[in-house]
Amino acid sequence: MANQKIRIRLKAYDYALIDRSAQEIVETAKRTGAVVKGPIPLPTKIERFNILRSPHVNKTSREQLEIRTHLRLMDIVDWTDKTTDALMKLDLSAGVDVEIKVQ
C-alpha cells in the first residue's frame, strides 16, 4: 500500500524465542516481496524484586529476583495484500507477544 507501513512490536521473556519469531516474520514478509526494516532490538526492561527469605526473622536476609523483558521492533514497507495474508497465517511461539499497527 502507498505511504503506509506495518509496525510490528515483539515482546518476550526469552531472547531466543523473540529472535526466532522475528526471523520468521522477516522471511515471510520478504517472500511476499515486501521491504522489511529491522528487527531493531529495543532496550531490555529489567524488573527486580526483593523478597524476605524467612517468614519471621532475619530481615537482612533477602532473595533478589529479576524478570527481563526483551523487545524487538520491525517496520514492513511496500507491503501488499499477500503480505498481510501471510502474516495472519503465521504461527509464532506462545511465549511471544505480538503487537501490529498499520501507520
Swiss-Prot record:
NCBIfam families per the UniProt record, alphabetical: PRK00596.1, rpsJ_bact
Gene3D superfamilies linked to this entry: Ribosomal protein S10 domain
Gene Ontology annotations of biological process type: translation
Protein family (similarity comment): Belongs to the universal ribosomal protein uS10 family.
Job description of the protein: Involved in the binding of tRNA to the ribosomes.
The entry's keywords: Ribonucleoprotein, Ribosomal protein
Gene Ontology terms: cellular component: ribonucleoprotein complex; ribosome
Subunit field text: Part of the 30S ribosomal subunit.
A GO molecular-function annotation: tRNA binding
Protein name as annotated: Small ribosomal subunit protein uS10
Organism: Neisseria meningitidis serogroup C / serotype 2a (strain ATCC 700532 / DSM 15464 / FAM18)
